[in-house]
Amino acid sequence: MPAVCVFFHPDRSPAVPFSPVPSPLVSAIVLNYKTPQHAVKCVQALMKQTIVDRMEILVVDNHSEDDSIGVLRNRLSTFPDVRIIETPENVGFGAGYNLGIRYARGKYLLINNPAKLPELHAAERLLSLMEKDESIGIAGPKLMHDDGTVRDSYRAFPGVTDVIIKRTFLRSWFPHRMQRYLQTGTNPDESRDVDWVIGGCLMIRRDLAEKLHGFDPQFFLFFEDIDLCRRCWAAGKRVVYYPEAVATDRKRRLSEGGVASLLLKPVGRAHIASAVKYFWKWHGAAAPR
């Protein structure tokens, strides 16, 4: 009997039984879309976490339409605590994670992109931070590239002008504004309250996620993390960057490049669409911090 449980449709019962961790404290959710090998490596990294005995792992396949499900079922069959959930269609980043949240049982949720590999103590350190301070709603780790360079893991809330300047020749004209937006003048080795952290790897309290109704599904890809952190601050909880927890990021930002390069790529056009939705949603609203 397979050890991995697959939900072929979210509203149906599991196809086969699995062996859940009793009363997990942390639910780690991995969202896969056509990168099953990365998802497997991510699960393997999660299984090495120092608090794995208090964690459950859910892998959501976002209707990849390739061999992802077969690869995941085969490669993860040795991990009886892992659940695989298959969406009936590609519902996007936020909605995909929301489905995982729906089935998660932990007090804390670790949102983990397959490209992010948490180091041995990462989950434990994020958990310890949040257990000690009830005012923290979301915590994000320091992200490192494979070459040892630090990836920007947090930024200030953007304005329309910030996004335009960053994508055009105007960037060199307004270096101080870009430094404020990109937070490049801050020390990545110091913990601090930040406007928002990268959604590819963060821990959020389950009760807060439920109060906020998870990610806003109108953002198919990009800006859902900014929106979530903004609502976290508005709900009276803090967003904290915590570099004592570290994760390796195997990919560069999907949304890098100027306006022209964004328009030429589907992922770039998705970024623009989400930006329009974000600024429309928050138009006229005061920053929550």
Regions flagged by a language model, labelled:
Residues H9, I29, I226-R289:
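Active-site-adjacent helix/loop segment of glycosyltransferases
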Residues A45, D61-G70, E89:
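A conserved acidic beta->alpha catalytic loop
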Residues A45-R54:
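Short, acidic, metal-binding catalytic loop of nucleotide-sugar glycosyltransferases
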Residues T87-A104:
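Glycine-rich, basic loop-to-helix element that forms the pyrophosphate-binding segment
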Residues L109:
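Short aromatic/hydrophobic "clamp" motif used to bind/position activated sugar donors
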Residues L120-S153:
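Conserved donor NDP-sugar-binding/catalytic core segment of glycosyltransferases
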Residues P158-D195:
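Short, flexible, basic/aromatic active-site loop/helix in glycosyltransferases
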Residues N187, D195-H213, Q218-V246:
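A short, conserved alpha-helix in the catalytic core of glycosyltransferases
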